[in-house]
Swiss-Prot record:
This is Porphobilinogen deaminase, chloroplastic. Heat stable and fully active up to 70 degrees Celsius. Its EC number is 2.5.1.61. InterPro entries: HemC (IPR000860), Porphobilin_deaminase_cofac_BS (IPR022419), Porphobilin_deaminase_N (IPR022417), Porphobilinogen_deaminase_C (IPR022418), Porphobilinogen_deaminase_C_sf (IPR036803). It is found in: Plastid, Chloroplast. The active site is at residue 157. GO terms for biological process: chlorophyll biosynthetic process; chloroplast RNA modification; protoporphyrinogen IX biosynthetic process. Pathway: Porphyrin-containing compound metabolism; protoporphyrin-IX biosynthesis; coproporphyrinogen-III from 5-aminolevulinate: step 2/4; Porphyrin-containing compound metabolism; chlorophyll biosynthesis. It comes from the Eukaryota. It comes from Arabidopsis thaliana. Belongs to the HMBS family. Pfam families: Porphobil_deam, Porphobil_deamC. Monomer.
Length: 382
């Protein structure tokens, strides 16, 4: 393991001071070895060993810590530079090495960090920035232009329409889709006193919180990576926050969790907990590599959920949740939700059918069309 990989779980611990009633333990927030990112209170002594290069196309190319290429890389992985994004890139790299002996040699796989629009604009809520692909566009452009060979994305960030000249032939096995409640003074949302502020940039989370707990307040401009948001919580900017349990597991930071919300309490985002890996349409070699890693059960579930999202034309301005899973009999169970941003109205639906691609896509679309019809014009403007 190189220094960059180990830094995710070792260096620079930040202690969250809990109140007497809290069930939250102290945590190790880790450090990031990345170029071109300003992450508060996070540093690494390995940074000095990296060099930053500016390409003619304007995107930042960066090595990760001391991950030096000993020869021309067979695969260049493009990723964002957050600790979670790097953890996902490392997971991809290790799975490729396990499957393909020719990729084991040092330098055979190189990681390129690319800064996205969502990384650059941190002062506004995502809903105010607008547009799609806030965390993927620049990485996809690097892929199309040949600067990288594969792009590792959090699937929940991937627009329903992929950029031209790209395909997404691989979903890694999905992590836990539920949301985690993080708080220094209470174990659950229900225990928070009236007027407490919950920090989340997600309209999906905001609408479901306010629907069930209208006495709480939500701070929308609560952005940044996991470490940054935990630091804001520690600093008293908010009393609690919700984070994807999948990300906390990948960062080995579940000790921060006060409780885990059930699917009835908080339906997840479409594709939450899933990693998607894209390549160029004409790159058969990379497509073959990625196909060898694909987890078909995850891919089918994501296809159902994204068909639902596409039907609703969902974006960061729309509170939408959806989750497809396989039951004990092997059937697909899909649950979908749309809400008004203020949480006063929530519409839900569900479907059950064969766990087969065509049937699951049809279920997702049908569920989306039902909720569109029930919502009516002006629903999302409330």
């Amino acid at each position: 393991m190189d220094i960059a990989s180990s830094s995710l779980s070792q260096a620079h611990k930040v202690v969250l001071t809990r109140q007497p009633s809290s069930r939250v333990n102290t945590c190790s927030l880790g450090s990031v070895s990345a170029i071109g990112f300003s992450l508060p209170q996070i540093s690494s002594p390995a940074l000095g060993k990296c060099r930053r290069k500016q390409s003619s196309s304007g995107f930042v190319k960066a090595c990760v810590a001391v991950e030096q290429k000993t020869r021309t890389a067979i695969i260049r992985i493009g990723t964002r530079g957050s600790p979670l994004a790097l953890a996902q890139a490392y997971e991809t790299r290790e799975k490729l090495k396990k499957k393909h002996p020719e990729l084991v040699e040092d330098g055979a796989i190189h990681i390129e960090i690319i800064k996205t629009t969502g990384d650059k604009i941190l002062s506004q809520p995502l809903a105010d920035i607008g547009g799609k692909g806030l965390f993927t566009k620049e990485i996809d452009e690097a892929l199309i232009n040949g600067h990288i060979d594969i792009a590792v994305h959090s699937m929940k960030d991937v627009p329903t329409y992929l950029p031209e000249k790209t395909i997404l032939p691989c979903n890694l096995p999905r992590e836990d889709v539920r949301d985690a409640f993080i708080c220094l003074t209470a174990a659950t949302l229900a225990e928070l006193p009236a007027g407490s502020v919950v920090g989340t940039a997600s309209l999906r989370r905001k609408s479901q919180i306010l629907h069930k707990y209208p006495a709480l307040h939500v701070e929308e401009n609560f952005r940044g990576n996991v470490q940054t948001r935990l630091s804001k919580l520690q600093g008293g900017k908010v009393q609690a926050t919700l984070l994807a349990l999948a990300g906390l597991k990948r960062l080995s930071m579940t000790e921060n969790v006060a409780s885990i919300l059930s699917l009835d309490e908080m339906l997840p985002a479409v594709a939450q907990g899933a990693i998607g890996i894209a390549c160029r349409t004409d790159d058969d070699k990379m497509a073959t590599y990625l196909a060898s890693l694909n987890h078909e059960e995850t891919r089918l579930a994501i296809s159902c959920e994204r068909a639902f999202l596409e039907t609703l034309d969902g974006s960061c301005r729309t509170p939408i949740a959806g989750y497809a899973s396989k039951d004990e009999e092997g059937n697909c169970i899909f649950r979908g939700l749309v809400a008004s941003p203020d949480g006063t109205k929530v519409l839900e639906t569900s479907r059950k059918g064969p766990y087969v691609y065509e049937d699951m896509v049809k279920m997702g679309k049908d569920a989306g069309q039902e909720l569109l019809s029930r919502a009516g014009p002006g629903f999302f403007g409330n």
